[in-house]
């Protein structure tokens, strides 16, 4: 038995294996709201242009509203034999309103239909992701203000480098999330053109108004080339690229959470809400949420890589390969959404061990650079010379097994006789962070100002800029 939607050319129905590989309703059913919205706008345009009767357009609109309600209340019967969301909606529309349903597909192909639906879907995802990232930023900035003066070790190569404040560290991720939001916003601007009306690939001979349908669906304009409109998925690739970068930022933070919460490090404690136990070891508090955020980056990056491979060899215009554009992308967007929410929750509830942070901040001679800077400022020593002198002083402290601020002044003067007791004042971790007043530096007053500025910006406009 042939498929009644496209079966006029065929004498027999498809093989069961063909049906199985061809069907996409399990995935593209998630486009139902976008598909129905685009169909309603298309029908209204057809009537406005005199292509179909106004009464038919009215019936179509009411029927589509009924279908939308049925899907939302789980009473709609999705049929795999009808392949995809477009055919399922059209078939049900025919059951509801009769022959008028057949007029809906005038001047339209599933090629421009699915391209339109998926653009609308990805646009919605971008808006949802932007809101989630803004909430994440707000949570980070709130905690940054709270811990603007909390001293912790700053790291390079995962070795203690210089003291910073915990608030400063949190604000670094506010900045990263801002750039992530900017990338999503850029992708949205390029995405926001309508493929609807491009038909199969060459446009249509009907006097349609593509500007009207574009406006009705919130697009800035119709796409200018019908071949391009139906055959490219760069809007998905660009959004997945932004998602992959955002996910990588989250993964880096999640990795820090895993390290910081280890009993060997002990800088931070996550709440019970975001940790789990062990089935055999009753003492365990595992940072599973952070570990899963870290792992989900693979799903997002994998979706980007997968779609790049799907698209890389496709000639114009539409190819059925493009049916594989949705599942990986949808799973990636879902993974990113969950990861953002999980990280937001962890940040909101985490408790830093401020005493341990302060103690760790002084480990590894972390204020050595402050001594070198003192030599430059006070003794007018070239920085490279100051670096060498400080290195010798650190070696002396290491040999004696003491911290830099515990090294006797006489031992320092044995290396550089002009050093005075004033140099000792710069060697505390508090003095170190307080001195970093350059723009973007870790000084607590800087951190407070930046955190407050971000909170004002986020509460006022929720802008990524």
UniProtKB/Swiss-Prot annotation:
One of its GO terms (biological process) is arginine biosynthetic process via ornithine. Its main location: cytoplasm. It comes from the Bacteria. The keyword Acetylation does not apply. It is found in: Cytoplasm. One of its GO terms (molecular function) is argininosuccinate lyase activity. It catalyses: 2-(N(omega)-L-arginino)succinate = fumarate + L-arginine. Its EC number is 4.3.2.1. This is Argininosuccinate lyase. The lineage of its organism: Bacteria, Pseudomonadati, Pseudomonadota, Alphaproteobacteria, Hyphomicrobiales. The gene is argH.
């Amino acid at each position: 038995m042939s498929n009644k939607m496209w079966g006029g050319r065929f004498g027999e129905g498809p093989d069961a294996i063909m049906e199985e590989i061809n069907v996409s309703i399990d995935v593209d059913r998630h486009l139902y709201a976008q598909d129905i919205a685009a169909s309603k706008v298309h029908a209204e345009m057809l009537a406005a242009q005199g292509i179909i009767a106004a009464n038919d357009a009215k019936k179509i609109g009411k029927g589509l509203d009924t279908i939308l309600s049925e899907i939302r209340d789980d009473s709609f019967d999705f049929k795999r034999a009808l392949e995809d969301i477009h055919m399922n909606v059209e078939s049900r529309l025919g059951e509801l309103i009769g022959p008028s349903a057949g007029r809906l597909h005038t001047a339209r192909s599933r090629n421009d239909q699915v391209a339109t639906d998926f653009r609308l879907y990805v646009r919605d995802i971008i808006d949802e992701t932007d809101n989630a990232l803004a909430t994440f930023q707000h949570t980070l900035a709130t905690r940054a203000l709270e811990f603007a003066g909390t001293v912790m070790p700053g790291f390079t190569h995962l070795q203690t480098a210089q003291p910073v404040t915990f608030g400063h560290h949190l604000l670094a991720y506010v900045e990263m999330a801002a750039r992530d939001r900017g990338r999503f916003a850029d992708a949205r601007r390029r995405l926001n053109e309508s493929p609807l009306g491009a038909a199969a690939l060459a446009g249509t001979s009907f006097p349609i108004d593509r500007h009207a349908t574009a406006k009705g669906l919130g697009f800035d304009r119709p796409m200018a080339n019908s071949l391009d409109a139906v055959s490219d998925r760069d809007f998905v690739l660009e959004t997945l690229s932004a998602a992959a970068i955002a996910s990588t930022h989250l993964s880096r933070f999640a990795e820090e959470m895993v390290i910081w919460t280890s009993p060997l490090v002990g800088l931070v404690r996550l709440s019970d809400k975001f940790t789990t136990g062990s089935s055999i070891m009753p003492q365990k508090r595992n940072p599973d949420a952070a570990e899963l955020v870290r792992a989900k980056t693979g799903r997002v990056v994998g979706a980007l890589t997968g779609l790049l491979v799907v698209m890389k060899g496709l000639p114009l215009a539409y190819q059925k390969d493009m049916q594989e554009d949705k599942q990986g992308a949808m799973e990636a967007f879902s993974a990113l959404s969950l990861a953002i929410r999980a990280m937001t929750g962890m940040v909101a509830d985490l408790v830093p061990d401020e005493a341990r942070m302060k103690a760790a901040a002084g480990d590894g001679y972390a204020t050595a650079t402050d001594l070198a800077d003192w030599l430059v400022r006070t003794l007018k020593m070239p920085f490279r010379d100051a670096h060498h002198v400080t290195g010798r002083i650190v070696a002396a402290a290491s040999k004696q097994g003491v911290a830099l601020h515990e090294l006797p002044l006489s031992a320092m003067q044995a290396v550089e006789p002009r050093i005075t007791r004033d140099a000792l004042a710069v060697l505390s971790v508090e003095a170190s962070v307080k001195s970093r007043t350059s723009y973007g530096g870790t000084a607590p007053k800087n951190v407070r100002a930046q955190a407050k500025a971000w909170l004002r910006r986020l509460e006022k406009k929720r802008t990524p800029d």
